[in-house]
Amino acid sequence: MIPIRSSITRILPNGFLSKPFLRQLNKKSKPNPHKNKNFDSFNEVFIHKTLLSSIKQHNDTDYVRCSIFNANGDMIQHGKEILKSQFIKRYNLTPRDFRKFNWQRSATGTTTTSSSSSSSAGQTSSGTSKSSSSSSSSSSPHSTISALSLSNSSLGSSTNVDIVPNITIRRNSILVQLLNIRALINHDQLIIFDNSSSFQNSHVSSYTHSQCLKDLSQRLKSTNLDGLPFEFKALEGILIYIVSNLNMEMKVHNTVLQNIITGLEDSIDRNKLRYLLIESKKIHQFHRKITLIKNCLEDLLENDDELNDLYITEKFNSEGDGQPRQGTNHEEIEMLLENYYQTIDEIVQIVENLKNQIKTTEDLINVVLDSNRNQLMLLGLKFSTGLLSMGVALYVSALYGMNLENFIEEIDGGFEVVTVVSTIALIALLLFSVKQLKKVEKVTMTSLNDQRK
């Protein structure tokens, strides 16, 4: 509390502050060195743990997590983490080959770093008894920053989806990136990279990844494809998985769209139109995705050199000759790719039909809404016509009811004459207006041509 004397004498007559008031302000603003010391120590620990977390995040990105199948279709390694430099050296790759593969650090490392930094910050802040309140207030921004980094990492991993497919051929391997499949195919190994690192979709992505690994293992163990090289078996297994997923997604979109269109046939409301808009966006995204996959296979089929380079086993067996495979004798891989290219092309055609259905539905909805709008406008014009006719009758009656002398009052039957005249004028104007409205309502192409002439 400021004393009464200082509160009274704080402002002098000349407009300056008094000395007692200045001393009071200096006393209030005097810093507490013990409190600042504790706060600085907490900031140092917080910055130190943040730097450690960033260093750990950088180190986690140097590892590649993958599952490896051998030539017999058996999974010899599952979820193994390998240094990226060792992986590149082992399979004769280049660092630019991994630009398409956006590696994310694991969720376990993130939670461990956050928990360790928060626990150490709590221990440091509880070291002194006088800084308990400051430690609680300081730990809240720490937890907020951890939560923000956690949400940003999960958001980045969930939205980090490469929509551009790619099949890259190297000297002794094939790099495949189609949908959520990122794989490396060798002459005797199939390597599937694990890129599921989202907290929100961890269960769904892990289940999908396990199903993919199971399907690929069964496909590689199939005895019906013993005549094909291993790289063709692996590539066909990946294409089968991709096509089945595309076909399933296409059926889901088709079912949802047909239900929406059926509902719009009964009634048109705001919610159904919103569902139609959302489904239209999803179908457009799906169409763009499968079109890119189709173009990827088409470009591969049109290049004979790349088709020859797909024979990894043959190049490995004849590596001592030093002669690359040439010519157009690549019927096996060409027939394999053409089969799935045609299947994907059929899916593209079906999706284009769905887009045409959406376009037709939108046009019909616009026509119906325009027709309803025209009906409302005509109804408003009819009411306006009736009010106009009634206004003429009211005008005549108003003239007759004025408090002025006129000859009609002296004539017998003047009231009847005014009533009949106003009624006739009302009916005549109403009939004329209705006739003009009918002409406006019955607009045809021939009438438009007549008006132009």
Curated annotation (Swiss-Prot):
Motif YGMN, residue range(s) on this chain: 400-403
FT transit peptide: 1-19
Ion transport among keywords: yes
GO-annotated molecular function: magnesium ion transmembrane transporter activity
Region (Disordered): 108-141
UniProt cross-references to InterPro entries, sorted A to Z: MRS2-like
Primary role: Mitochondrial inner membrane magnesium transporter required for mitochondrial magnesium homeostasis. Modulates the conductance of the MRS2 channel. Involved in the splicing of mRNA group II introns in mitochondria by affecting mitochondrial magnesium concentrations, which are critical for group II intron splicing.
Name of the protein in its database record: Mitochondrial inner membrane magnesium transporter LPE10
